[in-house]
């Protein structure tokens, strides 16, 4: 029996994935470690206070830029997800009991770090009666209570499309409500078997109808075609998505989906122009862009478009 480091048995899909060696990255997949004064101060603070961010723990290549802008991302709900997506490094399994003190700790971390903008994401919690809706909403509420001048972006699962659970989350009023579609319809079930493409679009539409600024992400290099990406961009815009990020898939381990191709930077430039032409209020596309990359600046850009005649929702 083959097991993963977390101790569970490998899925057949993971065994098949592992037969393909980790791909060699092209020369354009690289970053420069530019450590400015804000980054250096924040890193020291995180060390002293024992704070935890997705930025560090996931080894995000954009940490230097985001921390220099006093932006950071936090993961809530535990280390085990009840769903498995073939690109995601978070492990699948039975999550620990709900930690009802987590919203306070995240809010205090945001406060201690002096963040201008915070992104909160989390695992799917299908084991909980409310799917984790209270946890997501309460984290936003607590951050806003302690940090009234800090923007909050909330990246959520689909809560199985449950209207009551979605409404509870929406009512916490994050500056941005994000739900990532990630890939195109043809390969969606293979990549995200516990999600549905149409349901993900419906979540974005519901958030937009509630009056929130909406956001999604597409990952390239998992077997899609450029024409399919263009179609997905049209679907997202038609669904009411305000902000879109587009990125290159980087394989976390041999048991994850192989990289089908490395998308050249020129293609990201073309897709960015295409998305802007569709009317997205904020667009970022590139090999090392991540869904939370420059999130505060993207929100400000989108808010100027969405709320041209009124102040942004806060």
Curated annotation (Swiss-Prot):
In what residue span(s) does the Radical SAM core domain sit?
67-281
> Chief subcellular site?
cytoplasm
* Cellular component per GO, a single term: cytoplasm
Annotated positions binding [4Fe-4S] cluster 1: 55, 60, 66, 292
- Name where it's found: Cytoplasm
Q: Which Pfam families match?
A: LIAS_N, Radical_SAM
Output the superkingdom of the source species: Bacteria
As recorded in UniProt, its EC number(s) are 2.8.1.8
Where does the chain bind [4Fe-4S] cluster 2? 81, 85, 88
Q: Keywords in UniProt for this one?
A: 4Fe-4S, Cytoplasm, Iron, Iron-sulfur, Metal-binding, S-adenosyl-L-methionine, Transferase
Q: Which reaction(s) does the protein catalyse, per the Swiss-Prot or TrEMBL entry?
A: [[Fe-S] cluster scaffold protein carrying a second [4Fe-4S](2+) cluster] + N(6)-octanoyl-L-lysyl-[protein] + 2 oxidized [2Fe-2S]-[ferredoxin] + 2 S-adenosyl-L-methionine + 4 H(+) = [[Fe-S] cluster scaffold protein] + N(6)-[(R)-dihydrolipoyl]-L-lysyl-[protein] + 4 Fe(3+) + 2 hydrogen sulfide + 2 5'-deoxyadenosine + 2 L-methionine + 2 reduced [2Fe-2S]-[ferredoxin]
Molecular function (GO) terms for this protein are:
4 iron, 4 sulfur cluster binding; lipoate synthase activity; metal ion binding
Which residues are connected by disulfide bridges in this protein?
none
The cofactor binding remark recorded in the entry reads: Binds 2 [4Fe-4S] clusters per subunit. One cluster is coordinated with 3 cysteines and an exchangeable S-adenosyl-L-methionine.
- Going by the record, the broad EC class of this enzyme is transferase
From the UniProt record, give the pathway where this protein acts. Protein modification; protein lipoylation via endogenous pathway; protein N(6)-(lipoyl)lysine from octanoyl-[acyl-carrier-protein]: step 2/2
Q: Which cofactor does it need?
A: [4Fe-4S] cluster
* Classification via Gene3D superfamilies: Aldolase class I (3.20.20.70)
Name the CDD domains for this protein: Radical_SAM (cd01335)
Which protein family is named in the record?
Belongs to the radical SAM superfamily. Lipoyl synthase family.
Name by which UniProt lists this protein: Lipoyl synthase
From what organism does this protein derive?
Answer: Mycolicibacterium smegmatis (strain ATCC 700084 / mc(2)155) (Mycobacterium smegmatis)
Classification from the root reads: Bacteria, Bacillati, Actinomycetota, Actinomycetes, Mycobacteriales
